[in-house]
Amino acid sequence: MISPTVIRWLPLGAVLLHLFEEFVWPGGFAEWYRWYRPERAASVTTRFLVWINALFVLMALIPVALGFRQRWTTASTRSEPPGTPYGAAFWLVVASIAAANGLFHVWAVLRTRRYSPGVVTGCIVYLPLAVFGFIYFWRTGLANLPTLLQAALIGPAYNVYAARNHRRRAKSLA
């Protein structure tokens, strides 16, 4: 079994791998997205991409900082750091947003029949991470059904919000 300490870091590792694929190797996400959605191209600035991805990296650090507990506790041993019930919830939200992003990349590839920077890590990292996390937190009792359902809905809801926001920003910048 994977240690909870390692599990806390998995979303951050996944996000960093995905960003590496999108922007370093092979890179080209910004150009690809502007080609894929020309009506939103004005909204996809370097400043926006840095800001939104920095925010996602920070979100992935929240479970690391909070830890996992069913209730607020204090450390009972040196090997068991204090945690909160919110660590698992944030972990699941990050995984849900990541999985929705992975599905966005898959949809774009199927629609265009062209490589989308981020589709590989979206498929082999983001989607399995979300499946693993939802099963793990349910089986360990670290997340209850309402928490799981809310997290599962936040990911797709964020993608819908982001698409609408890109449209709005592009119109105001045009």
Regions found by a protein language model. Give the residues of each.
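Non-cytosolic membrane-interface motifs at loop->transmembrane helix junctions
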Residues: 111-124, 143-150
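Cytosolic, membrane-interface loops and tails of multi-pass inner-membrane proteins
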Residues: 22-43, 165-174
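N-terminal signal-anchor transmembrane alpha helix
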Residues: 2-22
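Membrane-interface helix caps and helix-loop-helix hairpins in membrane proteins
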Residues: 72-73, 82, 106-116, 137-142
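Transmembrane alpha-helical segments that form the membrane-embedded catalytic/substrate-channel core
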Residues: 16-23, 98-109, 156-169
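Terminal transmembrane helical module of multi-pass membrane proteins
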Residues: 130-174
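Core segments of transmembrane alpha-helices
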Residues: 48-68, 100-101, 125-130
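Hydrophobic alpha-helical membrane segments
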Residues: 93-105, 116-137
